[in-house]
């Protein structure tokens, strides 16, 4: 009787010898080995004494297989770590490691982890620093409505490493949409910047922000803290619970109206048309015929200050760039081996809340962006048709008094640092930190591995400073205070 389960047949291989040529001898070579834990079967004519040797060979083969698999896993773990983990310097495929914030190709740093991640994804998709920066800025417009948004005013500074030129993005003169409400210019400004310097298609940059607004995002600590300190009456129901209390950390928020505006903007072929979708809906909300003149952002050559060590670039008036250049020039001409801590800046009438981000690649191209709604949550009243908070920045004198991004291009032979970028949140105190950091760098030039903005901002009061640099074909990002702003790279 045949067994219920068929036996497993193996061929025992013998070294071929000329004397073994007959069919009968070849048939005798074939032996039947049955793998059965109950013991060996002798139905094939095998001698029981031969089975232990076969089992030993099988065990040895399995052991070798296990060892080989283990070695392969260890090799993958040591060389295949994913680069660009949030806030990490994961070792690249080349096998050497870096400190956190140092990457081979490009990096981005922003106030929101979700937006830094989105910027990195645009890098990986083949985009450049402008694609990553603009995409992250649109993301911040969704997840950080307390500091920025589609109603915000934007300033930017872009340095092209290939040409050596730096270009300033200006918001144009402050305009009023309605009493106490600033004319929104974010969409045409960002679209203009991308049209001239971006690489990926414009709609690609809005896919992530649209998804966040449509499917929802989580309230982070920064937004939750701002909500806790704010009268939320004009922010409900978007940022409130059903009982009117502000949302806390980890609460999911969806803004479908904003998603619809972003979708329309993604289809606009020109910067001017990208802002029209928002303006037409805002006019309906406010009962207006529409603004007589649209926003007028511009791209123009950055201001320059030649120095013995290199060239300093910043944004033109009405930003705070010219005043900062005057301050830096006066500080460098004054006697003394080192810069004075926290040099005083010209006093501004107000210190509006703002948002900053920075991107850099290993070739030395840098993009710095800063934006503001003037106050926390701007006007404090949510547009029901658009899900947008408008700015209350309407005084032309204050249109850019808070904006002062700086880029230093090194042309000396004494240091390997190619480009250094600094951008601070919109307070005079933070700008003093930025000025002091630049003066310290000029007085004692060091590599980014040796130097970083690790000074506590408490030395010059509160503020946020982002620093990016390109050095020895690597991109470097860091912040003051350390850890305040998530970064990613690849």
UniProtKB/Swiss-Prot annotation:
Molecular function in Gene Ontology: glutathione hydrolase activity; leukotriene C4 gamma-glutamyl transferase activity
Cytoplasmic side: 1-52
Post-translational modifications reported in the UniProt record: Cleaved by autocatalysis into a large and a small subunit and the autocatalytic cleavage is essential to the functional activation of the enzyme.
Reactions mediated catalytically: an N-terminal (5-L-glutamyl)-[peptide] + an alpha-amino acid = 5-L-glutamyl amino acid + an N-terminal L-alpha-aminoacyl-[peptide]; glutathione + H2O = L-cysteinylglycine + L-glutamate; an S-substituted glutathione + H2O = an S-substituted L-cysteinylglycine + L-glutamate
GO cellular component, one term: membrane
Keywords for the protein's UniProt record, in alphabetical order: Acyltransferase, Glutathione biosynthesis, Glycoprotein, Hydrolase, Membrane, Signal-anchor, Transferase, Transmembrane, Transmembrane helix, Zymogen
UniProt-listed GO biological process terms: glutathione biosynthetic process
Glycosylation sites: 160, 165, 374
Entry membrane topology: Single-pass type II membrane protein
Highest taxon, organism lineage: Eukaryota
This protein's pathway: Sulfur metabolism; glutathione metabolism
Entry-linked InterPro entries: Gamma-glutamyltransfase, GGT_ssub, Ntn_hydrolases_N
This protein's record includes keyword Transmembrane: yes
Record field: transmembrane: 53-73
EC number(s) per entry: 3.4.19.13, 2.3.2.2
Extracellular topological domain: 74-490
Subcellular location: Membrane
UniProt family annotation: Belongs to the gamma-glutamyltransferase family.
Protein purpose: Hydrolyzes and transfers gamma-glutamyl moieties from glutathione and other gamma-glutamyl compounds to acceptors.
Subunit details: Heterodimer composed of the light and heavy chains. The active site is located in the light chain.
Name this polypeptide is given: Glutathione hydrolase 6
């Amino acid at each position: 009787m045949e067994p219920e389960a068929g036996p497993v047949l193996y061929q025992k291989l013998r070294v071929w010898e000329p004397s073994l040529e007959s069919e009968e001898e070849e048939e005798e070579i074939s032996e039947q080995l049955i793998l059965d834990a109950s013991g060996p079967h002798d139905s094939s004519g095998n001698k029981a004494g031969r089975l232990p040797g076969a089992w030993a060979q099988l065990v040895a083969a399995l052991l070798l297989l296990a060892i080989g698999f283990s070695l392969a896993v260890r090799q993958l773990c040591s060389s295949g770590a994913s680069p660009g983990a949030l806030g990490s310097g994961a070792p690249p495929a080349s096998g050497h490691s870096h400190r956190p914030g140092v990457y081979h190709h490009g990096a981005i740093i922003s106030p929101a982890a979700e937006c830094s991640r989105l910027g990195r994804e645009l890098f990986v998709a083949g985009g450049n620093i402008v694609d990553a920066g603009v995409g992250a800025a649109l993301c911040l417009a969704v997840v950080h409505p307390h500091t920025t948004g589609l109603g915000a005013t934007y300033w930017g500074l872009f340095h092209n490493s290939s040409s050596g030129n730096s270009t300033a993005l200006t918001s144009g003169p402050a305009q009023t949409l309605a009493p106490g409400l600033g004319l929104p210019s974010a969409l045409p400004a960002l679209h203009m910047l991308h049209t001239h310097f971006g690489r990926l298609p414009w709609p690609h940059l809005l896919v992530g922000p649209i998804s966040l607004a449509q499917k929802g995002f989580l309230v982070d600590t920064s937004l939750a803290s701002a909500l806790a300190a704010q009268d939320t009456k004009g922010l409900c129901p978007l940022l409130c619970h059903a009982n009117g209390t502000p949302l806390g950390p980890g609460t999911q928020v969806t803004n479908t109206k904003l998603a619809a505006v972003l979708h329309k903007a993604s289809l606009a072929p020109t910067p001017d048309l990208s802002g029209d979708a928002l303006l037409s809906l805002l006019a309906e909300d406010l009962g207006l015929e529409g603004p007589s003149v649209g926003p007028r952002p511009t791209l123009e050559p950055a201001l320059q200050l030649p120095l013995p060590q290199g060239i300093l670039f910043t944004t033109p008036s009405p930003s705070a760039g010219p005043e900062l250049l005057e301050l830096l020039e006066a500080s460098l001409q004054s006697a003394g081996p080192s810069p004075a801590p926290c040099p005083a800046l010209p006093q501004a009438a107000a210190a509006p809340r703002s948002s900053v981000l920075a991107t850099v690649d290993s070739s030395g191209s840098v993009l710095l962006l800063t934006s503001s709604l003037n106050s926390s949550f701007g006007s404090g009243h949510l547009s029901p048709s658009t899900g947008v908070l408008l700015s209350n920045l309407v005084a032309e004198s204050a249109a850019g008094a808070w904006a002062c991004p700086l880029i230093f291009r090194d042309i000396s032979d004494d240091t390997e640092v190619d480009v250094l970028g600094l951008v601070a949140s919109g307070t005079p105190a933070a700008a003093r930190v930025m000025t002091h950091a630049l003066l310290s760098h000029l007085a004692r030039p060091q590599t980014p591995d040796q130097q970083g903005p690790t000074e506590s901002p408490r030395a010059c009061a509160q503020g946020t400073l982002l620093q990016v640099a390109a050095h020895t074909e690597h991109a470097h990002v860091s912040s003051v205070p350390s850890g305040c702003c998530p970064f990613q790279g690849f």
